[in-house]
């Protein structure tokens, strides 16, 4: 850590950080506190804490995915059969799987955010990422803008149909010249002379659910201000383009949208002119989380396929599952799955706690709910990045176990390999999500929101006297490894601020590697906290795999922290 003499560093004094007066954030529920809290010091939500109702929700969705969707995953669900898709979506509506964030008075089931995570994992046992996409869009970016920012009339008009599955939802953000820089939208809306319509002109690309959707939340500029509006299928001047021919996700709909003097009623505007960031980015924030969470079931399914194949495949007179190299791949797959599982439920547990403290009778309740999830943008980006990259690594291992058969379409790995690649691109590329994570944590550190000033003082002590987490137990070495990574992050951030000051936000390589350290720290923290919390249960059930997963992940990935630090400092 740098001394107070550093001009642009994090100056630690009684008045705050870098001259900012600090509020008392100690009792506020917000994201990012994992950095300054010791591993295991707070209770984390995990599968072992599922209520009976949550267990029922999990089994219901998993049963639907396994019994209704999985038999169709290698064939029918890859044909873009709109009639079949609508039938299955309506079935999900009847089961209450579409209105998870929607109040009952608008036709929804309004589950907790933990329920949302449970369903996101459960549906991914279907073996069809294409159909998972239909559900993900329907329940996040295609509807959350209306739930959180729509008025009562808008909610009454569109949400019941979305919840029942009668209407399919979509979201139009990306443009030919505005991808990750979404606020650079060239699509415009101009108020008509009679004041009754916005005349919309522009184009959107890569729109999931696009060919089938009935309602579209569309981002655009009105009077130069980023806004969001709902456009209905069939509106004059609104045309849906041809399906894109894609490398993977063959069963999902992906089309461009065209607006040519499209007359959209002014009452379709979500919020006010200039409020577009809320509907667009709050929905994306949850969509990112769900993308990561929905990888869990798919990873479990991939492992199941690989284990069954390895047991049945004979080579050199024995099952290949007996070979150490195959066992290593399966062990790595188990570690990836358990750590992602732990991370997802830890993240959503914190958000659920924060949302539960909101006043449901507050007229701004749903806007505040969206704003609350934004406080966890770093953690949600971590879930998206780690989930997509963990799934990619696991699929590669399982593909390799299949050998040449992995390359054959009638076996499950070829489709999984192709379909997963997009997950590192949509919902914001992994590079963009690392930027979001890194910048969000810097903001929280400088604001005093996560107690970073006080934490730096502890790091000073660590550097002089050695690290002592205060934890005593079988996992002491692993806990202190993760705590050391947090300290390394603090040192690297302080050094970077000293060198670059306010310009640090433009130093992408530095931000990316700071984010890499945070990803390791949060995944390690979540996994170790879960194992420590459930130690007695695991001993009782003679379950040794969770602790082994935590130990191996901490050791193997911890080595990389110094590589990231060297890139930052050098």
Model-derived features with residue positions:
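Alpha-helix capping/hinge segments and adjacent helical runs
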Residues: 18-20, 29-34, 67, 96, ...
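A short core secondary-structure module
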Residues: 196-240
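Glycine-rich beta->alpha junctions and the first turn(s) of the following alpha-helix
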Residues: 19-20, 46-50, 56-57, 239-341, ...
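N-terminal glycine-rich flavin-associated loop
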Residues: 131-153, 179-182, 191-194
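C-terminal helix-coil-helix/basic helical segment that borders enzyme active sites and/or dimer interfaces
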Residues: 73-80, 338-386, 399-400, 501, ...
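Amphipathic, small/basic residue-rich leader segments at the start of a protein or domain
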Residues: 1-137, 147, 153-157, 161-164, ...
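A short, Trp-centered hydrophobic/proline-enriched beta-strand micro-motif
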Residues: 165-173
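Short Gly/Pro-enriched turn/cap motifs at secondary-structure boundaries
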Residues: 177-180, 206-209, 221, 246-253
């Amino acid at each position: 850590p740098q001394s107070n003499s550093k001009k642009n560093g994090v100056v630690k004094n009684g008045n705050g950080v870098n001259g900012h007066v600090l509020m008392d954030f100690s009792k506020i529920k917000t994201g990012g506190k994992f950095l300054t809290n010791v591993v295991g010091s707070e209770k984390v939500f995990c599968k072992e804490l599922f209520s009976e109702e949550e267990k029922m929700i999990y089994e219901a969705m998993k049963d639907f995915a396994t019994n209704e969707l999985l038999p169709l995953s290698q064939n029918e669900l890859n044909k873009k059969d709109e009639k079949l898709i609508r039938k299955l979506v309506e079935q999900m509506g009847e089961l209450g799987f579409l209105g998870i964030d929607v109040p009952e008075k608008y036709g929804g089931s309004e589950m907790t955010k933990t329920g949302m995570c449970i369903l996101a994992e459960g549906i991914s046992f279907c073996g069809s990422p294409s159909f998972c996409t239909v559900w993900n869009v329907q329940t996040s970016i295609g509807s959350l803008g209306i739930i959180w920012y729509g008025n009562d009339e808008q909610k009454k008009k569109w949400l019941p149909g979305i919840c029942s599955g009668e209407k399919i939802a979509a979201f139009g953000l990306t443009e030919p010249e505005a991808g990750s820089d979404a606020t650079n939208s060239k699509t415009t809306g101009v108020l008509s002379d009679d004041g009754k319509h916005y005349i919309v002109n522009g184009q959107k690309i890569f729109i999931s659910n696009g060919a089938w959707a009935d309602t579209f939340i569309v981002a655009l500029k009105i009077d130069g201000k980023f806004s969001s509006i709902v456009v209905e299928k069939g509106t004059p001047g609104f045309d849906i383009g041809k399906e894109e021919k894609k490398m993977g996700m063959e069963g999902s709909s992906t089309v461009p949208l065209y607006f040519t003097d499209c007359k959209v009623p002014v009452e379709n505007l979500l919020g006010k002119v200039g409020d577009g960031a809320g509907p667009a980015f709050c929905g994306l924030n949850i969509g990112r989380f769900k993308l990561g969470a929905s990888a869990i079931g798919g990873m479990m399914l991939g492992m199941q396929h690989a284990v069954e194949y390895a047991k049945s495949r004979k080579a050199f007179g024995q099952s290949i599952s007996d070979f150490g190299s195959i066992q290593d791949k399966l062990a790595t797959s188990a570690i990836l799955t358990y750590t992602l599982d732990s991370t997802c439920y830890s993240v959503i547990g914190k958000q659920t706690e924060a949302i539960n403290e909101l006043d449901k009778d507050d007229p701004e309740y749903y806007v505040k709910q969206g704003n609350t999830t934004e406080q966890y943008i770093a953690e949600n980006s971590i879930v998206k990045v780690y989930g997509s990259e963990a799934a990619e690594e696991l699929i590669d291992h399982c593909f390799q176990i299949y050998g040449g058969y992995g390359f054959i379409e009638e076996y499950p790995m070829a489709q999984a390999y192709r379909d997963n690649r997009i997950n590192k691109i949509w919902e914001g590329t992994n590079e963009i999500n690392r930027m979001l994570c890194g910048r969000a944590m810097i903001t929280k550190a400088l604001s005093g929101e996560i107690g970073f000033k006080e934490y730096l003082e502890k790091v000073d002590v660590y550097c002089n006297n050695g690290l002592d987490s205060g934890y005593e137990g079988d996992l002491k070495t692993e806990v202190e490894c993760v705590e050391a990574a947090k300290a390394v992050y603090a040192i690297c951030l302080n050094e970077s601020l000293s060198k670059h000051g306010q310009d640090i936000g433009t130093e992408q390589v530095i931000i990316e590697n700071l984010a890499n350290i945070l990803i390791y720290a949060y995944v390690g923290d979540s996994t170790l906290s879960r194992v420590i919390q459930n130690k007695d249960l695991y001993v009782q059930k003679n379950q040794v795999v969770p602790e082994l997963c935590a130990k191996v992940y901490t050791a193997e990935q911890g080595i990389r922290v110094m590589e990231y630090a060297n890139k930052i400092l050098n």
